[in-house]
């Protein structure tokens, strides 16, 4: 139930370090970059809510570690709710990314499995990076030793980009696609659509295809029509 990178395949193209818009999270970016490429670097624990960029950094780290020649495993723990014990079988990789470790909270056997993995990785020199909604001290863990181990990592509470930063990112990414987003379009979009950067960039990809197919500029009427046809829940 873990994900390894098969030969010839790639991690998500957009979720690379160079596409991470750090804002106030420059120190976290630097720490994760170091962990992914330099053996012996401090382990990292990233916390933050939806849209904070923690999964982006995790995927970017996996990709960078793979490109540096390391064997990589990625565990999306929230997606493994019925298979938490897969954690116990994780072994043999040089870089392991554990996404949403808070999903294990309250699962006694899974907490012990993660505790054992932590200790094995430390003994074997494996690099670990963790993400969760909250800092280790705030997790509802039943195993105090696990909380202590996670708390020993270098911790970063990721801060979401401000609206002004999201607008600039969206304009810049649109320009790379040959799309002009004027302030009127951005005002309309930000008033009616999710402000999560990942969702906005996904929308931009779809707008790029739709505007090319229709041979039209992205205007408010075009955007309104596009969202209506897509049956967006945000419209």
Specify the residue positions occupied by each region the protein language model found:
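AAA+/P-loop NTPase substrate/partner-engagement loops
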Residues: 67-95
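Conserved AAA+ ATPase "sensor/coupling" helix adjacent to the nucleotide-binding pocket
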Residues: 153, 167-180
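C-terminal helical "lid" of AAA+/P-loop NTPase domains
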Residues: 187-191, 198-212
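A short, basic N-terminal segment
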Residues: 1-34, 39, 212-235
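Short regulatory helix/loop adjacent to the ATP-binding pocket of P-loop NTPases
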Residues: 136-151
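Conserved nucleotide-sensing/catalytic segment adjacent to the nucleotide-binding pocket
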Residues: 86-131
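Conserved AAA+ ATPase "SRH/arginine-finger" region at the nucleotide-binding site
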Residues: 153-165
